[in-house]
Structures are given as structure tokens and as C-alpha cells.
Amino acid sequence: IGDLWARFSAVAAANPNAWVRESLTAEQICEVGPDNRMISWPYPKLMNSNNMVDQSAAVVLCSAEKAEYLQIPRDQWVFPHAGTDSHDTYSIAERDELHRSPAIRIGGARVLELAGIGLDDIDHVDVYSCFPSAVQVAARELGLALGDADRPLTVTGGLTFAGGPWNNYVMHSIATMAHRLRENP
């Protein structure tokens, strides 16, 4: 788990908008101490979402016609090709298997189908990362490798290191992804 989170930390270290821009080792992340107290076994503070941040993000959506009218350069345009919405039961006690997420599996398969692409067509990924287990479950359900150095599971550095401003983390993910896609479509 520490190695997984160290990879997230390394991405955050290169993210100019991340809250924690120091690349931490697996040992630093896992070792419990005064600055990294145990929150809930097996996760110390550095494996939990960091919501004590002062951040914001925004995305402006408009038609291509409006973008042309506003003279937004075409190389700044990013098009969403598909989207889905799914959720597992909110009550953890009602879930059949805590290590699975039918919603992620079904929603992920459907969005790829709607976009007409496969996982191998995707270079950039950002998996919701409130805790390592959320990343492990999502990666498993989507068929993503946990240790793929060529395709990290985050573009921001995740909620621990990039910052998790309560309900706005995904907006940070989308905004960062838009920048990444402009650089490398």
C-alpha cells in the first residue's frame, strides 16, 4: 500500500497545484509518528484524504460555436466523448463484497463502450483516491494495473497529496486532465 501511495505522492510533487509537493517514500507514508498519526488501521494520516486545504477549480463547458465566438484557440479545446453515472449502495453494511464495486465495473465498461474505445486507448487516468482501498477496488474493477509506471492512476497526485477539498476533488481531476490532454491528446 505504501508503494502505491508513494507513486501518488510522486505525481503530486510534479503538480504545481498540489497541496503537498514533496515526494514521500513508502516508508515515510506508512510509518506512524507524531506527524503521521494512525487514523483508522491500516491507514495513517498520509493514507487519508487531505481535506484541510484552501483550493478551488473550475471548468467552463461551451459549444464549439461559442468557443469560436470567444476566440478560444482550438488547441485549448477538450471534448468529453462520453459519461456515465453509477453508485454502489451508500450503506457499507449492505454491500455484498467490500472489495468489489459493481457500479465502477458497470459504469466503467459502459463509458468505454459509449466512447468507442478500450482501456489501451487511454493514456491518462485519475482514479478517485480518498484511501488506498478505493484505488485498489477501482483499479481492479476497471482492469487497470496498480503499478503501471507508464500510466499512473492519478494526474493530480490524489486526495492525500494534491488535496481533497471535500466535494470538489473531481473538479480538480477534470481541470488537471484537461491540461494534460492539451499537452498530450
Task: Identify the residue ranges that each predicted region occupies.
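Conserved "HGTGT" condensation-loop signature of ketosynthase/thiolase-family condensing enzymes
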Residues: I1-V53, A57-V59, A64-K66, I72-F161, ...
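Glycine-rich phosphate/pyrophosphate-binding beta-alpha loops
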Residues: F161-N167
